[in-house]
Amino acid sequence: MEPIPKLLAGLLLLTLCVVGCSSQHWSYGLRPGGKRNAENVIDSFQEMAKEVARLAEPQRFECTAHQPRSPLRDLKGALESLIEEETGQKT
């Protein structure tokens, strides 16, 4: 390689290293901040365990939309009543 492309590649690599090293540090629990004390590590893990347990609980949702009457349900009801009439006439 010629000296100019080597110099450009070196500057690009240096720039990427500086940007990567000076970026935001994410610590325990994926929360922004600096380094944590060893005492806070247990608290962070306990907090994460509580969040996981809360998310693992089944969530109940209520349907507030009005569901129109199904024509299949009407047909099923009519067939059931017809069958009852037929069996009632035979006995």
From Swiss-Prot:
Protein's GO biological process: regulation of signaling
Keyword Transcription regulation attached: no
Glycine amide carried by residues: G33
Site (Cleavage): W26, S27, Y28, G29, L30, R31, G33, G34
Gene Ontology cellular component terms for the protein in this record: extracellular space
Keyword Signal part of the UniProt annotation: yes
Entry keywords, A to Z: Amidation, Cleavage on pair of basic residues, Hormone, Pyrrolidone carboxylic acid, Secreted, Signal
First and last residue of the signal peptide: 1-23
Positions carrying Pyrrolidone carboxylic acid: Q24
TM stretches of this protein: none
Subcellular localization, as worded in the UniProt entry: Secreted
Site (Appears to be essential for biological activity): residue numbering on this chain: W26
InterPro entries: GnRH, Gonadoliberin, Gonadoliberin_I_precursor
Gene Ontology MF: a single term: gonadotropin hormone-releasing hormone activity
Family as reported in the entry's similarity comment: Belongs to the GnRH family.
Function per UniProt: Stimulates the secretion of gonadotropins; it stimulates the secretion of both luteinizing and follicle-stimulating hormones.
Name the record gives this protein: Progonadoliberin-1
Organism: Sus scrofa (Pig)
